């Protein structure tokens, strides 16, 4: 178990962009990935979208309760990376779809939907995460996370970052009082992201520690 530190002042990261389309990696099941109305249902996977049109990059939101997506410097962005190297990412592009964690090697064609901007929430001690490509925000929903239109009036989009003595953070939902959890040892190439009791767990079946890491980018070989 990780030991939480008493306070947190975390801001800033480096970033870049990539302009690729999502690839056709398949997942088990074929049911809808749209978040159900019931708050007790777990996220369910489906095959990845293919032939997705290219999206505008280097996006973030500006001021106001329903923030508009505006161009921004890529240095404003970061990734949220688990200890197994999996990155928190949008998977289905439509709003109110579940978020997942994918290793970089299996999500290279996802492009900038794996990058996030951390910015203050309505309550200054909390933060929210804005997707670089879509301008949507991470939102606590049921037993997992979805992405939806950003609104400062949505408490479900505010999160508290709890530092640990390992340099990682635990991400706590303000609205639910539960923490973002993933399965670090998985038989698939993705990890399910859920909300569970905050205990700083680091186990093969569940982990709550995340790193605020540099954004992913398309690398170019230098001859």
Curated annotation (Swiss-Prot):
Keywords attached to this entry: Cell outer membrane, Lectin, Lipoprotein, Membrane, Palmitate, Signal, Toxin, Virulence
Pfam family, one: CDtoxinA
Domain (Ricin B-type lectin): residue spans on this chain: 123-212
Regions that span the bilayer: none
Signal peptide: 1-15
GO MF entries: carbohydrate binding; toxin activity
GO cellular component: cell outer membrane
Role description: CDTs are cytotoxins which induce host cell distension, growth arrest in G2/M phase, nucleus swelling, and chromatin fragmentation in HeLa cells. CdtA, along with CdtC, probably forms a heterodimeric subunit required for the delivery of CdtB.
UniProt name for this protein: Cytolethal distending toxin subunit A
């Amino acid at each position: 178990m990780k030991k939480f530190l008493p306070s947190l002042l975390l801001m800033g990261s480096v970033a870049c962009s990539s302009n690729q389309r999502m690839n056709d990696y398949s997942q088990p099941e074929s049911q809808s990935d749209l978040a159900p109305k019931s708050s007790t249902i777990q996220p369910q996977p489906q095959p990845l979208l293919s032939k997705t049109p290219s999206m505008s990059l280097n996006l973030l939101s500006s001021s106001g309760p329903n923030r508009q997506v505006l161009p921004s410097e890529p240095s404003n962005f970061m990734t949220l990376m688990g200890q197994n190297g999996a990155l928190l990412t949008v998977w289905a592009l439509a709003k109110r779809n579940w978020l997942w964690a994918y290793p970089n090697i299996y999500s290279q064609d996802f492009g900038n939907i794996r990058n996030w901007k951390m910015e203050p929430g309505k309550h200054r001690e909390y933060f929210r995460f804005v997707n670089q490509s879509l301008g949507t925000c991470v939102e606590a929903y049921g037993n997992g996370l979805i992405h939806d239109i950003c609104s400062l009036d949505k408490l479900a989009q505010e999160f508290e970052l709890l530092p640990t003595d390992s340099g990682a953070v635990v991400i706590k939902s303000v609205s639910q009082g539960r923490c973002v959890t993933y399965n670090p040892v998985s038989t698939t190439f993705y990890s399910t992201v859920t909300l569970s009791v905050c205990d700083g767990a680091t186990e093969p079946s569940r982990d709550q520690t995340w790193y605020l890491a540099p954004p992913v980018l398309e690398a170019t070989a230098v001859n």
